[in-house]
A protein has these predicted regions:
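Alpha-helical transmembrane segments of multi-pass membrane proteins
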Residues: 1-236
């Protein structure tokens, strides 16, 4: 029986209830490999994310202040903060790139982390055994590697068989990681207070983790430009 005050239910043999108009929702653009967020109606960062990231960065700032000392002593290492932000952003970009090329699995993520660690180790050993070029040369090579990664589209790699695709993706992803660690190793050799330098670098890494959410607006490919700008700021 209908609720009190509600319209009576249709009866067998009575008039047929029908909609006179058809409802159609807004037409949304499909998600792409560069912007793989099908449930995000508009390119934006939700306010809840902004509040969460702000709280994390504030907490990180306080902890680093307690561990690293006064902020005035950190000014001479501001370039290390830019390096930390750029490197974490680069690592995040590589994880997403491999997920798009090979699938989002624990094995693929493990390969990325192993590749990053191997690139870091090779850079450390290279810096220890070989006399590195001047910083402008290293920074120039790093920017070139980022530009190459920008110019090669994902579609070009997806058309390759699995093994060549993996080798090409590894070269594009880990060459900047290797060069970035050569830059870091060369700079860190000149620091006078390693604890403060690491604190500044860690704070920069936290900022880089927050900057990853820019991909909700710009897509992941633009992160390469952000990485290049951060390393440019570290150089100057």
């Amino acid at each position: 029986a209908p609720a009190r005050g509600a319209a009576p239910l249709p009866r067998p043999g009575g008039p047929v209830a029908a909609c006179t108009t058809y409802w159609q929702g807004p037409s949304l653009a499909p998600a792409t490999d560069d912007h793989p967020f099908p449930y995000l109606r508009n390119p934006s960062i939700p306010s809840s994310f902004v509040r969460m990231l702000g709280a994390i960065l504030l907490g990180s700032l306080l902890l680093i202040r307690l561990a690293g000392g006064r902020f005035t002593g950190m000014r001479s290492y501001i370039d290390l903060a830019f390096m930390g932000a750029a490197f974490l952003l680069l690592e995040t970009k590589n994880i997403i790139q491999f997920a798009l090329l090979f699938g989002t699995t624990w094995f693929v993520n493990s390969l990325v982390f192993a590749g990053v660690l191997l690139a870091v180790y090779l850079a450390v050993e290279t810096a220890r055994r070989v006399r590195l070029p001047r910083p402008p040369v290293l920074y120039g090579a790093l920017i070139v590697s980022l530009a190459v990664a920008w110019l090669v589209p994902q579609e070009a790699l997806l058309s390759l068989p699995v093994i060549p695709r993996f080798l090409a993706a590894s070269a594009l992803a880990f060459a900047p990681v290797f060069l970035a660690n050569l830059v870091f190793a060369q700079r860190f050799a000149d620091v006078h207070n390693s604890g403060t330098a690491f604190a500044v670098n860690l704070l920069g890494a936290m900022v880089g983790g927050a900057l990853e959410y820019l991909s909700l607006i710009t897509g992941y490919r633009v992160l390469l430009i952000v990485i290049g700008v951060l390393y440019g700021l570290a150089f100057v």
